[in-house]
Regions:
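His/Asp/Glu-enriched short active-site or ligand-binding loop at hydrolase and phosphoryl-transfer sites
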Residues: 137-139, 147, 152-165
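N-terminal regions of proteins, emphasizing targeting and processing segments when present
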Residues: 11-13, 23, 72
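C-terminal segment of classical bacterial N-terminal signal peptides
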Residues: 17-25
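Bacterial N-terminal signal peptides that target proteins for export
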Residues: 1-13
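Short, compositionally biased "basic patch" segments
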Residues: 29-37, 150-153, 157
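Active-site beta->alpha N-cap acidic-glycine motif
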Residues: 30-115, 119-120, 126-132, 136-138
Length: 165
């Protein structure tokens, strides 16, 4: 109930302000601040873009959230956790069918910066593979807690993905 109200208020405020919502366009038009050639940290001033993103799902709130977004004609980027994807693969397919972007938020939501290269690779690639099996190509990786290092960037680059904070 509180989540739905918060989403309605935020969505209405954005729409009333006349802000365009374009999930995932930060790297497409060069408007983002890029670090190490692959990590998008923030949008440039004056770009008139707003990215609406949700992390840690899919969850019990995802279907209601999708309904609210659909009613308002809004698309968003959902950064999903692999453990949750295994329990709700049908929601991932529906999210994509409804025009939302799907991003990788690692398999178990661990702080990547504190993991070995192999453990980071496993956290990221296992989600990429789960998504591929569902017909989803994830162009963006959002490290949990915003924690990443040069190894994370290299793994993302090898996957053809960008780090998106």
């Amino acid at each position: 109930m509180i989540l739905a109200r918060l989403i309605r208020v935020c969505a209405s405020a954005l729409l009333c302000a006349g802000v365009s919502l374009f999930p995932g366009n930060a790297s497409a038009d060069g408007a983002g601040t890029v670090v190490d050639g692959r990590a998008i940290l923030k949008m440039s001033k004056g770009s008139n873009l707003c990215a609406l993103t949700f992390d840690d799902g899919p969850s019990s709130h995802t279907e209601r959230l999708m309904e609210i977004l659909r009613e308002r004609g809004i698309h968003a980027t959902f950064f999903v956790v692999g453990k949750q994807v295994k329990y709700h693969p049908e929601l991932i397919v529906r999210l994509q069918q409804e025009g939302h972007e799907i991003g990788n938020h690692t398999y178990s939501h661990k702080s990547l910066r504190h993991l070995s290269v192999d453990a980071q690779r496993s956290e990221i690639l296992s989600v990429q593979e789960l998504l591929r099996k569902l017909g989803v190509h994830s162009r963006y990786i959002r490290p949990p807690y915003g924690n990443f290092d040069a190894n994370t960037v290299a793994i993302a680059k090898a996957e053809g993905a960008d780090i998106m904070l």
